[in-house]
């Protein structure tokens, strides 16, 4: 059921992309469910066939391995789907990205203005202290 050769090229329209994601989700979950059900059927089956018991056990074990591998493949496909959804949300959520950029730039502007005010205050204090020192130096009798 799970198609092994999925393309990573995304459809252009948002609706088609969401339908594609939904179809992938349904296919992978269906594949996992069907394979799991078949493994359970194999595990409890009492064989009354003409094949020897050893041969039947080997055949059942091989089929279980194949179905387990199909379940793993479907699980990996689901993990890839989750990664694709995360990437889609990160890359196409412009409103949140713009809001975060605006908030950060406003924060940086506020920080810059606070630093500018502190520097101006420090400059003014240093100018006053320098003026006082120069006045003291030039009016001193010890020059």
Curated annotation (Swiss-Prot):
Keywords: Activator, Nucleus, Transcription, Transcription regulation. GO terms for molecular function: transcription coregulator activity. It holds the Pfam family Med22. It comes from the Eukaryota. Its main location: nucleus. InterPro entries: Med22. GO terms for cellular component: chromatin; mediator complex; nucleolus; nucleus. One of its GO terms (biological process) is mitotic cell cycle. It is found in: Nucleus. Coiled coil: none annotated. Component of the Mediator complex, which includes at least CDK8, MED4, MED6, MED11, MED14, MED17, MED18, MED20, MED21, MED22, MED27, MED28, MED30 and MED31. Component of the Mediator complex, a coactivator involved in the regulated transcription of nearly all RNA polymerase II-dependent genes. Mediator functions as a bridge to convey information from gene-specific regulatory proteins to the basal RNA polymerase II transcription machinery. Mediator is recruited to promoters by direct interactions with regulatory proteins and serves as a scaffold for the assembly of a functional preinitiation complex with RNA polymerase II and the general transcription factors. Belongs to the Mediator complex subunit 22 family. This is Mediator of RNA polymerase II transcription subunit 22.
């Amino acid at each position: 059921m799970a198609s092994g050769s999925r393309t990573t090229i995304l459809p252009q329209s948002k609706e088609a992309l969401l339908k594609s994601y939904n179809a992938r989700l349904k296919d992978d979950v269906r594949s996992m469910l069907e394979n799991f059900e078949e493994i359970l059927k194999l595990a409890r089956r009492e064989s009354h066939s003409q094949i020897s018991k050893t041969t039947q056990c080997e055949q059942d074990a091989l089929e279980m391995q194949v179905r387990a591998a199909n379940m793993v493949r479907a699980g990996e496909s689901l993990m890839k789907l989750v990664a694709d959804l995360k990437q889609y949300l990160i890359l196409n959520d412009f409103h949140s990205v713009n809001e975060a950029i605006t908030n950060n730039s406003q924060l940086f502007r506020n920080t810059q203005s606070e630093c500018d005010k502190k520097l101006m205050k420090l400059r003014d204090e240093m100018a006053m202290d320098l003026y006082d020192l120069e006045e003291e130096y030039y009016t001193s009798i010890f020059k």
